[in-house]
Amino acid sequence: MRAGTVAVCCLLCAASGLPAARSSQGDREPHYRNCVRLCERNNCSGAALRAFGKMQPLHMLATGWRCADDCKYNCMWATVGLYIKEGHKVPQFHGKWPFYRFLFFQEPASAAASILNGLANYVMLNRYRAAVPFQSPMYRTCISFAMVTLNAWVWSTVFHTRDTLLTEKMDYFCASSVVLYSIYLCCVRMCLAHSIC
């Protein structure tokens, strides 16, 4: 019990020295906040919202872009323009650097990288299946690892296509599952190598 109390005290002392969490520089900018508030008030209710819905491309609707999201996106670039005009560094918004949408991809380069990584993983999975006999001791463990990894790349692609609270959590949870499964895979491999499993 005493060791647990000491650990809690150490954790509290360490946490007390941490600075308070703040929003990104761009989020705190009065110009950005006013722009978003005015845009949402003028465009995201009543007849203006209906007009937005009629003009919104199908691919943007399918990926969940709402009027308020569009306001944030446009105001982000208006604020970035002011920063550049004044000779300041471009700030982050909502914990991310400004991004250019392409079609329905919120972060096209990151989404493309995730797709390519997933594709490489899929190709290697098929090569592994073709080269390694099913009876091999690590076969199912390695196939499972490939499936966990493929799932992580799918969620990474989804997250970089459209950043929402759900897609962000799924991206991070699935990436963490790859790390955890890697540790498991190493332990199983070590056990088999030393014949202790």
Model-derived segments and their meaning:
Residues A3-C197:
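Multi-pass alpha-helical transmembrane bundles in non-GPCR membrane proteins
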